[in-house]
């Protein structure tokens, strides 16, 4: 006898309502981001099934394949309008799409899962989604780096006290500070490229991790979906679930750490005690009690959200660390973790790019911050130029710090012209990296979208 508090799913199993809600989790919401990619994966799979030769009877004919692909294109169109629903009894996007196709195409819709498991289905969906999102994030990352370069170029050689241990150290410039952060942001492309390469592998056809007794052409779906290669071992394809999510989260967490340091510098340098930079008022909030306050809440939240993303990365790694071979339901949560990290990083990059674009420099405040001690190393090096050994020059200055005098900060920074220092910053290097990375991301996105358009027509 069926329990009153139960529901029948598309797989014909009757599940207690509380169990269904607990196991489905947030998938009915999260999987909205995967509808397009699930349809793309299904289109590739059905196309491949229609091309299998040597069977007594085709699993799917070419005509049927075309009908399925047309219906999948309709599902994507509905999803783009917000009109495609993933129900709780669907459990996920895969069963929702199968239900929709079965409702429209009858028995033909029931054929699309042949030779597949939801294990390799979700793995394909997630990898296609991560590939697309990495490329979009790379463009956002480049936009922030460009904003920092523009900010630095406008300030040019405005002197800025360089700091170590947060203490005054040596003469620097605003441009050096800004482009230094721009370079750190750009360097994060390496981490995203590593995550992209890992995601760019096709698990489709591995089914539940052990293959199927059908002559599936896995290389064909790799070609149709635009992956660089197939994950050869079916068990290995199953084991790789969660790995690309964790790798993506690692890149996201590392980037957030870089952005958090940028945010901290901007908080400090915009304090009244420093006042080197002025943050745009629209990015600051007031106080409910102190009328004079303009707080850098946005930048403080960048620091706070960094803790969140690092936490999600740690959660993903912990999820995997003692998991037995083969699929385990724990892996469902890897999707939630990377999607949260993705959205946090995307919004952070966008708001920081706008904030940097609206930030201004107080050149007088920057120059006024130079104390005699900031020039100590320069004084010692002038002694070296006069023939004094470095260590003797160092101790001579160290022993007579009270004799140091203020110097012209502008002249001090102009004395540094070798590669990468105050007057040795080549903006062209950064602009070329930004241009090349943006162009490559757009080219890859166009190729991925091209695969999608070809399959869903």
Model-predicted segments: where are they?
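Short, well-ordered beta-strand elements within core beta-sheets of diverse protein domains
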Residues: 45-56, 176, 244-254, 379-386
